[in-house]
């Protein structure tokens, strides 16, 4: 028995340890339940959160605005973000960075870098020698990469979300333009790592908008496909998307709505910013013409003046969208000269005429990629701020040939709301209604490799092969497996972009390198030597295009296969019996699914890639498999593979083959006798086929990134440290400013209080002069030396002043509280005295209070009266400038003591059962004897806390009183002090009404 107890103790300890760990995990999880989304626009960003009790809410920034400028101002000793940075664009345009997202993932020779220099010549860009990218040179000692600047913005967005949610947030979904390539997407992910954010997904902004549109219209989506076009023209870019909505059947949740991206078209430079730049140039020209002959400098050479003109151009674009003309005016544009000029909408449209001609371009691209016509589009919906320009709507309406353009979506916040819905769906802390999202690959990706072939006996040559890995407009996320055959030594292959003919020449130059990665495999020959008795099934490379649209090579492995015959003698009687029974129901043997060793893998069921075709001569050299195909029951099944290039493990549909595959038919025929009778055990031993066993060997992989090298880990760590130091510096600055403001406010408030009568009444002239002198000295110090003072010094100065004024403030505060506290004490004393008098007037036969209880209450009342009178008399003798003896906390303590005694008696009166009156033979009530005391009557008293209730016998009540008085079988609801009791009739009525509600 002792041994058993000893064995149970470790188990109990382990159980309690697991419970403690689980509780700790739950508590940690509850602190970080909120998730966020960031809609990164070219000019501004929108942040949304989801937390328990707050479903899908846009975050308000510190200025209570729903969108925040994507602007950063960097100086030597300070940094500004958001609206404060946008305000610094006029004062310090060189240090204020905007529209830097256009530089992400681009090298110095990219046309977009030259365009950025032309648009914002005030910024100095230098070249990173390692990656050949650009960096902002703020000062000789201060430079930042575009990823670092974006990391600052993302960190700022998280701080806004955390302040709004009132809890820490780490998980986020970030929107990116649909046309971002691999280098640009990796740059955003690196920026998020610098900010300390865990990116659940990089979602395309057009997909997020489509998701937001579908989520709020779930009821309108049915099995009939609905094609909707979203035209999104923002500040910097334009994207047109064709989306198909319909319900599909899923394995997990049955019929659910789905959105599928069918076509995408875009223009990287068409947007509101280009219109503003045209207007800025027009205003600069007008200003120069007004100053002609004054020997003035060109306004274009003044960065501050150009920043003012750009801000005015932005305002003009907005106003001219609703008015035919407007007066542009800027005070002190340059050299204290004011600028004023009238601009009409017609002039603005003439300046941007070539831009409006490009509006239909993305529409045609989207239709071509979707292989659809405008007749199949049911609705065209406007998204983005630049679509509010009337000319854009006019040209677009003519291009799509519709009666009207849809404006039934929040053009500014739709992407943020869709992204935060996806964040909640990806988070484990929330459960949302399923909405299937099938995004599309914009740029096809293929695998290229070369191998030696023998065209003629003795003549060998190299043959270049290509295979599409992810086709254009194919769905993602999904994984692919490429199998390389006939390789007996180490080899290389390349991952590149596919056919980009749909891009124009300018877009191809902006796109950058079309070569992604070179993969070098090591250990192929050694793996073949390791398994000489196995048949090689080739080298399998596993690729994954994840939810963020980022391509990765998960692993490369060498696969071998052999036939293994199971010995019938090894099977037990139970195994034979189980196999026989399972064969009666058409099931296979369990031995076919066994794994042999740790390296054996199960057969995968794979399907061919959409749109991939084998070139002549490639069959047998390379096979392609779909590792994790995206489920879509609405799409037709892929065609049956032919030849050696068919995906391994592919099995025809059971319905097409009569419910049996070719590999299963001989086995099933051998297992079943006439009329389905199972064969004898001897026959089963002979007819049982050998099973296949797979062995895999990991192959070494060396990757060489060709499009844009990622930041090395040490460089990334330095960037993270740099951003953390800036954040700490900002926090210290905020803390110092808060301390300085508190000190300054205390000085001003106290100086004013010294002249108020209530403060002069409780202080002497000497005391006021001492305080006033200290305040003046601190104020002088703050003006002279406060700019260089640390946070600790400011807090110490404030603490000294508060200590000096503590007595004065205490006396004033006490005198303010006296009237209210004394009035409350008097009321309580009066009510307590009245209650005591009433209690003593209760007839002796009905008395529920003991003499000790009433005497105790009387003593407390008398003591309180005596304390009050004595303290007031003593306080009247003291001068107002001395510390008072009548303290508000003492008054509150006396009130609490008196109230406690009264509440005890009140509770006793509430819950005491009245003594039932017995009846005589004639049916009349018998009065208790005159000499009956209160202690002889039955009562129920609420016992003090921590003491058990004493059980007392209770006489059975009369039948006539059972409806109004509770019986012993009915539990009484006991309330605490101050609780109100309700009549039993009302409780019964409530019970009856609740029963009626249930019916």
Curated annotation (Swiss-Prot):
Has a pivotal role in cytoprotective cellular mechanisms triggered by oxygen deprivation. Promotes HSPA5/BiP-mediated ATP nucleotide exchange and thereby activates the unfolded protein response (UPR) pathway in the presence of endoplasmic reticulum stress. May play a role as a molecular chaperone and participate in protein folding. Belongs to the heat shock protein 70 family. Residues 574-583 have a biased composition (Polar residues). This is Hypoxia up-regulated protein 1. Induction: By anoxia. Keywords: Acetylation, ATP-binding, Chaperone, Endoplasmic reticulum, Glycoprotein, Nucleotide-binding, Phosphoprotein, Signal, Stress response. Residues 564-694, 909-999 are annotated as: Disordered. Residues 1-32 form the signal peptide. The modification N6-acetyllysine is found at residue 883.
């Amino acid at each position: 028995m002792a041994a058993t107890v000893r064995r149970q103790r470790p188990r109990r300890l382990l159980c309690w340890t697991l419970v403690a760990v689980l509780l700790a995990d739950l508590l940690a999880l509850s602190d970080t339940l909120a998730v966020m989304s960031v809609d990164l626009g070219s000019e501004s960003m929108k942040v949304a959160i989801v937390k328990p009790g707050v479903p899908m809410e846009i975050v308000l920034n510190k200025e209570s605005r729903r969108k925040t400028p994507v602007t950063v101002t960097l100086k030597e000793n300070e940094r500004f973000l958001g609206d404060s940075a946008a305000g610094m664009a006029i004062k310090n345009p060189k240090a204020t960075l905007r529209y830097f997202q256009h530089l992400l993932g681009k090298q110095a020779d990219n046309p977009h870098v030259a365009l950025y220099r032309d648009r914002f010549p005030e910024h100095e860009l230098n070249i990173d020698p390692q990656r050949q990218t650009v960096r902002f040179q703020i000062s000789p000692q201060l430079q930042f990469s575009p990823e670092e600047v974006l990391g600052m913005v993302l960190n700022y967005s998280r701080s806004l979300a955390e302040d709004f949610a009132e809890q820490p947030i780490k998980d986020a979904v970030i929107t990116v333009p649909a046309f971002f390539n691999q280098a640009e997407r990796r740059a955003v992910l690196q920026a998020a790592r610098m900010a300390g954010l865990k990116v659940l997904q990089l979602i395309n902004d057009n997909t997020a908008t489509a998701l937001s549109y579908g989520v709020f219209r779930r009821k309108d989506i049915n099995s009939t496909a609905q094609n909707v076009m979203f035209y999104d023209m923002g500040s910097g870019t334009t994207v047109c998307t064709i989306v198909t909505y319909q319900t599909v059947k899923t394995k997990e949740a049955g019929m659910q709505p789905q959105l599928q991206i069918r076509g995408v078209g875009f223009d990287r430079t068409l947007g509101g910013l280009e219109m503003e730049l045209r207007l800025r140039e027009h205003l600069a020209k007008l200003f120069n013409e007004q100053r002609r002959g004054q020997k003035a400098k060109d306004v274009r050479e003044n960065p501050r003046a150009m920043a003012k003109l750009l801000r005015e151009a932005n305002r003009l674009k907005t106003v001219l969208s609703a008015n035919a003309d407007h007066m542009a005016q800027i005070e002190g544009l340059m050299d204290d000269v004011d600028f004023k000029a009238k601009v009409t909408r017609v002039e603005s449209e003439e300046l941007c005429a070539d831009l409006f001609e490009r509006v239909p371009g993305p529409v045609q691209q989207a239709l071509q990629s979707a292989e659809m016509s405008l007749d199949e589009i049911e609705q065209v919906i406007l998204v983005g701020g630049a679509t509010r320009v009337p000319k854009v709507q006019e040209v677009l309406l003519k291009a799509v040939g519709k009666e009207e353009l849809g404006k039934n979506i929040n053009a500014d916040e739709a992407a943020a709301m869709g992204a935060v819905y996806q964040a909640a769906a990806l988070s484990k802390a929330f459960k949302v209604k399923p909405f299937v999202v099938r995004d599309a690959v914009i740029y096809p990706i293929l695998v290229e490799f070369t191998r030696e072939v023998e065209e003629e006996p003795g003549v060998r040559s190299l043959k270049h092969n290509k295979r599409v890995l992810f086709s254009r407009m194919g769905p993602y996320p999904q994984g692919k497996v490429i199998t390389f055959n006939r390789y007996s030594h180490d080899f290389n292959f390349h991952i590149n972009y596919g056919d980009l003919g749909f891009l124009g020449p300018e877009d191809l130059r902006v796109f950058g390198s079309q070569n992604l990665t070179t993969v070098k495999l090591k250990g192929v020959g050694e793996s073949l030597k390791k398994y000489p008795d196995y048949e090689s099934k080739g080298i399998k490379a596993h690729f994954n295009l994840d939810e963020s649209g980022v391509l990765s090579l998960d692993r490369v492995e060498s696969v071998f296969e052999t036939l293994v015959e199971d010995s019938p003698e090894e099977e037990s009687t139970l195994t034979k019996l189980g196999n026989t029974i399972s064969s009666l129901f058409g099931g296979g043997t369990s031995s076919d699914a066994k794994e042999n060793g740790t390296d054996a893998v199960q057969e995968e069921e794979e399907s061919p890639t959409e749109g991939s075709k084998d070139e002549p001569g490639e069959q047998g050299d390379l096979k392609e498999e779909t590792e994790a195909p995206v489920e879509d029951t609405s799409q037709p099944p892929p065609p049956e593979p032919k030849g050696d290039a068919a995906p391994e493990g592919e099995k025809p549909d059971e319905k097409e083959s009569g419910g049996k595959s070719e590999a299963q038919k001989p086995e099933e025929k051998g297992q079943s006798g006439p009329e389905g009778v199972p064969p004898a055990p001897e026959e089963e031993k002979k007819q049982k086929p050998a099973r296949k066993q797979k062995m895999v060997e990991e192959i070494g992989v060396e990757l060489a990134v060709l499009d844009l090298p990622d930041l090395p880990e040490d460089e990334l760590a330095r960037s993270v440290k740099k951003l953390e130091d800036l954040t700490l510096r900002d926090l210290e600055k905020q803390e110092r400013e808060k301390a300085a403001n508190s000190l300054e406010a205390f000085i001003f408030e106290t100086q004013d209080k010294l002249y108020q009568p209530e403060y002069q009444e409780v202080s002497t002239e000497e005391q006021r002069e001492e305080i006033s002198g200290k305040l003046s000295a601190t104020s002088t110090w703050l003006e002279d030396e406060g700019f260089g003072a640390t946070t600790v010094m400011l807090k110490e100065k404030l603490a000294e002043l508060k200590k000096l004024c503590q007595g004065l403030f205490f006396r004033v505060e006490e005198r303010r509280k006296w009237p209210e506290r004394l009035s409350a004490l008097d009321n309580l004393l009066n009510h307590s005295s009245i209650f005591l008098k009433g209690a003593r007037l209760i007839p002796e036969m009905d008395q529920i209070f003991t003499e000790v209880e009433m005497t105790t209450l009387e003593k407390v009342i008398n003591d309180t009266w005596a304390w009050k009178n004595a303290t007031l008399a003593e306080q009247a003798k003291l001068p107002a400038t001395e510390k008072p003896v009548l303290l508000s906390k003492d008054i509150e303590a006396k009130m609490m003591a008196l109230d406690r005694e009264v509440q005890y008696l009140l509770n006793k009166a509430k819950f005491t059962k009245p003594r039932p009156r017995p009846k005589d033979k004639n049916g009349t009530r018998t009065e208790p004897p005159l000499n009956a005391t209160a202690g002889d009557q039955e009562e129920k008293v609420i016992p003090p806390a921590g003491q058990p209730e004493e059980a007392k016998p209770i006489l059975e009540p009369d039948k006539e009183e059972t409806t109004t008085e509770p019986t012993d079988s009915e539990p009484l609801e006991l309330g605490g002090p101050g609780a109100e009791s309700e009549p039993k009739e009302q409780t019964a009525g409530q019970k009856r009404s609740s029963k009626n509600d249930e019916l």
